[in-house]
Amino acid sequence: MTDLVPFSGRTLSEAASELGEGPTFDPGTGTAWWFNITGRELHELHLESGRKAIHPLPFLGSVLAVIDPLRQLIASDQGLFVRDTESSKLGHFATLEEKPGNRSNDGRIHPCGALWIGTMGRSAEKHAGAIYHVAGSRVTKLYSNITIPNAICFSPDGATAYFTDTDVNQLMRVDIDPATALPTGDPVLLSDESTSPGGVDGAVCDADGLIWNARWGASAVEVYKPDGQKVARYAVPATQPSCPAFVGAKAERLLVTSAWQGMDDAARAADPHAGKTFELGIEVKGRFEPAFRL
């Protein structure tokens, strides 16, 4: 097993989210964004100044993407919304599915500007979710019978997508059209983690094609080569890290969200940093997230 590198980073936000998720970074404003899904909150952090804000939401938001300097796309249990960055006003943009018991979970923007977004049951009901492709307002279902969609990310050339169903805990890869982000083949197994500690959660793919994956329940971020070889493990000071994001002026730092979901009082006392947001404390070769293309 790859040796675990001790945590050498810092806490970016002490606000403990029940389910911190969906971090991203807007290089135009130098601002990191993430969600407390179950708390119906959108968190904002200006990295240079340290200025923080928490925006209440009327839904369970999980993924944010920049559209342009004045607009953001948010995925939620009620569909896709456009958020005005100045007024925080929300406008409905598209419906993902007609399943009121579901919510959005993990997702990411492909280099072509399309969105891959996963849905799941609010209580992680078996096979209740799916993974969708969104191009403008056109929604296409890609994969059904997903329990907990996660690890959605794309290779730098846009020709490969990665994803998992955390309930199965197998990291998958699939060839896709770089121009559209639509699959051109069937998913194949990249790494079987079904007998390994923790769950394969959110992931990002760096400029070298390495996959940085948050390992829920294992207090770590793990790094894979495109062939599935695990090459590094970095400790996170919380048991349930949920998703990473590249941040900083050159996307050279790694932010990681976490969660205290499912913990009783004793577990939370033993895990005092659960739900906080961290910087890993290492230099990475990250990539900025593309804008969503309307």
From Swiss-Prot:
Q: How is the cofactor bound?
A: Binds 1 divalent metal cation per subunit.
Q: EC top class, in one word?
A: hydrolase
Disulfide bond positions: none
* One of the GO BP terms on file: L-ascorbic acid biosynthetic process
Q: Which domain of life is it from?
A: Bacteria
Name the cofactor(s) required for activity, per the record: a divalent metal cation
On whether Cell cycle is a keyword of this UniProt record, the answer is no
Quote the function comment for this protein.
Involved in the degradation of galactose via the DeLey-Doudoroff pathway.
- What protein does this entry describe? Putative sugar lactone lactonase
Protein source organism: Rhizobium meliloti (strain 1021)
> Taxonomic lineage per UniProt?
Bacteria, Pseudomonadati, Pseudomonadota, Alphaproteobacteria, Hyphomicrobiales
